[in-house]
A protein has these predicted regions:
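Conserved glycine-rich acetyl-CoA-binding loop
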Residues: 100-111, 123, 134-141, 145
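A generic secondary-structure micro-motif detector
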Residues: 47, 106, 128-129
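Generic structural motif
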Residues: 28-29, 73, 102, 126, ...
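Acetyl-CoA-dependent GNAT
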Residues: 5-95, 100-101, 113-114, 119, ...
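Short loop/turn motifs at secondary-structure junctions
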Residues: 93, 124-127
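Short C-terminal domain-edge/linker segments immediately following a structured domain
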Residues: 54-56, 111-113, 125, 159-163
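C-terminal "cap" of GNAT-fold acetyltransferases
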Residues: 3-13, 126-137, 144-164
């Protein structure tokens, strides 16, 4: 059984979906998030450590993100880290989506993505953007299925947008 207070340093919202699933919304704890990113680095289509400064990323996510954590049967199953601080543009940005290997195939990313979309609506944001590789077919198709459209395609690296 996980302690959500180890994962999130602040909890803004709690959505109990059923007796086995809860989505928590808040700021990720720095130590947890860094450990999580490094532990799951090779799960990403292109490992994060090879393309970003992990410490700077962890600090930015801790400081600026709204993170959605799905807990299923007492275990952290996945998360989405997003930014909703650009009030003038009314545009959010998903910076990281991840479902732990042992929880894949259960449509948990769909649950998290719907929570992010509902959050955007609730704070009157008009758009959510994200970057994804077309070759990362599971992620690319997930976003298409949930109404994201390709805005730009730079050699297979796509900027996608969802509009409320």
């Amino acid at each position: 059984m996980i302690d959500i207070n180890v994962i999130l340093s602040t909890i803004e919202q709690v959505h109990t979906l059923n007796k086995n699933q809860t989505v928590y919304v808040g700021k990720p704890a720095t130590a947890f998030f860094k450990e999580y990113v490094l532990e799951h680095d090779n799960d990403f289509y292109e490992p994060l450590s090879g393309r970003i400064d992990v410490d700077a990323f962890v600090n930015k996510v801790h400081t600026l993100s709204t993170t959605f954590v799905l807990v299923q049967e007492g275990e952290m199953a996945g998360l989405i880290a997003s930014y909703f601080y650009d009030l003038p543009s009314e545009k959010g940005f998903i910076t990281l989506t991840h479902t732990r290997q042992e929880f894949r195939g259960q449509h948990l990313s769909t649950i998290l993505l719907k929570a992010v979309q509902e959050y955007a609506r609730s704070i009157n944001f008009k758009y959510i953007d994200l970057m994804v590789y077309k070759a990362n077919a599971p992620a690319f198709n997930l976003y298409l299925k949930h109404g994201f459209k390709v805005m730009t395609d730079d050699n297979g690296r796509c900027l996608m947008r969802w509009e409320v």
